[in-house]
Curated annotation (Swiss-Prot):
Annotated InterPro entries: UreF, UreF_sf
Species annotation: Sporosarcina pasteurii
A single cellular component GO annotation: cytoplasm
Keywords: Chaperone, Cytoplasm, Nickel insertion
Segments crossing the lipid bilayer: none
Subunit structure: UreD, UreF and UreG form a complex that acts as a GTP-hydrolysis-dependent molecular chaperone, activating the urease apoprotein by helping to assemble the nickel containing metallocenter of UreC. The UreE protein probably delivers the nickel.
Stretches of the chain forming a coiled coil according to its record: none
Taxonomy, superkingdom: Bacteria
Keyword Nucleus included in the entry's annotation: no
A GO MF term: nickel cation binding
PANTHER family attached to this UniProt entry: UREASE ACCESSORY PROTEIN F
Subcellular location: Cytoplasm
Protein name in UniProt: Urease accessory protein UreF
Amino acid sequence: METYIQESDISNEDDLKAFCDMYLRQNLASTDAIIAQEAYRLAKENDLQGLIRLENICHAIKLSPETRKGSMMMGRQFLQTVQPLNNSELFTIWCEKLKNKEIKSHYPVVYGIYTAMLGVDLRTSLETFLYSSITSLVQNGVRAIPLGQNSGVQTIFSLLPVIQETTSRVMTLDLEHLDNNSIGLEIASMKHEFLHSRLFIS
């Protein structure tokens, strides 16, 4: 997103809303949300090997090095935050595998595992995953454009129906529907690495 802001493609609240709407429907719905959903299901089945395979798929579908690095960093930070809150055997094993550098711990995989072990239903898991992804994006947009906090709140509020709609759509999909078709985002992410100045990683 920061690339688009510096290239003046995102310069106001309406642009930010349109970008986040597109990001939900065209990017998250066909990539990370499907990964998070599949991680949730595999965790419910206690399928460790399936989760490792899923994480390899997640790693492969992220074409930009910055996107890959950002997903792993977020996953590790999230894992570090929630690890003391969950003592399930699967979650403990996952933490050990990360410690031993056997896995990369991408964010959507960790999120799916954690919410499954937490006992929330799948819809809540997906809605909160999408909500947290979009609120982070909006907060970054508010800082980088820049916009006022009210614009950020209004943007998030306007996207709530899109989050619900996207959740319903993702729940009808599976790994066969995984599709990284957001070429513009991937190119922007690759260009982001070489921006003269930047506030965020991809």
